[in-house]
């Protein structure tokens, strides 16, 4: 086997016939500016070939489920192992998928609870046990040798028989005696007396003396089995002459309740055996939404936390509840957020003293009254106002049957564990003490669980809980979870290709991520990472830089070699090398912009926020920082953005919990959240249509003499509408043929040969270029072309795309092929191109995603251009290059999850760097130092 992966003549996308060698079993980073060809080399060449070879080695039956990848365009690739790609995508859209199921930790927890879980009665709190013959023998052996005892079985009359018939049947089976009314009697004597209808009669199975000999123990086991059989799973031991009795039951019951025996299916919310019957294992139902009924949890019942009980008429329900609350010591002056779960249940479902009442004051009864009055319009409106997707009232969001809650390990149920942040869960397992038998049975399972929890901690996800939905994770979080799953599977001899695993990761956790990648390498794998993070580049064994620029100006290998040897490459045309050597830097601003106007959020307590007060300056660049899970998104996306939207009279989701918003709100006319979601709702949308440049291009072609002569309007030059587009492929340029045993074949359309338009439309040209030629130009090429021919309107609309570093993408590039970071920058370009004069707050969520140092420099220039026009920039960011250039920093923390949500530091970057409690400040200090 070759000691390196050798790629010869790669020509995928913009790669210029490059030759690359990647040492096997190393940690390699592929770097370069956006659009230089990194992903073309890593994913479209390396991964495509590794996956293709692996899939083609399988049977045709297996291939139909896997699909097949096309062979990448290159001369050859040698020494490539099976490839696994871990991308920044939220792969699971399944509403049942959680962090626990994705990492397989939950599967091991289910098995652990099924194997060593102990069931406890919710009534007495005593452990529920199912006895066996072994328990009977153990009890007998606690007595001294020679002690006499009797094995008894309670008599259960079979259906259709009388007690007399049952006893006669026992006589025929060879049984002689019974125990009734504290006395032993012969069955025939008892039958002769004629008093058979007694309440409780026991059948004597055997009379024995305590002895530890094998024969006696074997006889005892046989007798116990017979007693369990005849007694319907129940039996007794009576020791003589004291008549001390011990009861045994093979039934799993206690306190009059029959319990379900623990099994892995009992703890599965994907199985009917374990799923909550009300919500079918989803944890949520359509019903009355608690957050809408009680939006402000800092208020008490007395202060009016239940908003549907406001108003002259509805207030009677509040007063009714308060009158009854004293009987059960309900704390009417306690804020709702401080009530116990039991007290909340009383408010929602009824007080214990009203248990048997036909009418009772509680929220459930109130809404039953509203539902019964739906024929009145005001009640229909009220019901609609408070209805939403809410937590299941039966399982309280745990998704499991109540029976699962009774099974515990170390005093905790499986529901308790999945609601703990991973960091606390790992500590709990480290402290868990088990008896010798449970330790032996659960040893392997505990090892797997602890290892996987440690992997999650190592990649900075200690703030997540195992019941967190997979589809609510960011792309970076999803990728790191998949990385943990890969480590847990312990594959060896594979090629792992990762796409920017550092996305969304604060500087503190980058070191941990590097260790995880090294662990993956140490297992015997080759790790290739497409990355822009400086620390990860410096930690790599091997560095490949693709460039020097983007698009047609990229696609070359401008540096390759040991990452430690870059000092010998001074004066390189590689931007990566120049930034790593300090030959080029992003300068710290000489001064910070002053500000007077601001918006204040009071008492923010959504998710883990601790009722904090935060000031957001206007007309400057503010960055919200903090470790993952510290509350940044809750503060900005969950509270500030929807609050401002509502204040401006725009429709949006309800903001999270907070006390109020104040300040210079009227100084803003608009608020825009620039996220990484795809541009446009149609897969046919492209950057040119989004920035409105394509409208001007279509107008230009419609003005040409041939168009005038043929009657072609601008609509004819659109591939989205009938008229000028090719009707065979509907303007797609390709025809997709479904293949069962292979991947779908995408063929060039035979009618238009991939040009998307009819021939007579393609005959219309502007300066020797038809509409298809223009759509295939990169942004940079199009600007150059239209500037040369003085089409200033088109140039002006395209220039903003160039300004944000997207000059390498094509005008007609399908929006579905753009990354999240590219989508975000297209939206930024749109706002820059608009030249909006009304003061606007622009909110960005990690805009440096996918950006090289050189691209960040361009991005900062775009931000400064918006601020110069009187707008405000607010950014959620981890990248120190952006943070050091901010005018104001808001640092949340100090950690993630329940250890976050506090305002750790605020002020200029220099002020935050001086704060000893701020982790951001610690790393910022190094960036600000000369």
Predicted segments with their positions:
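Conserved phosphate-binding elements of NTP-dependent enzyme cores
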Residues: 1-930
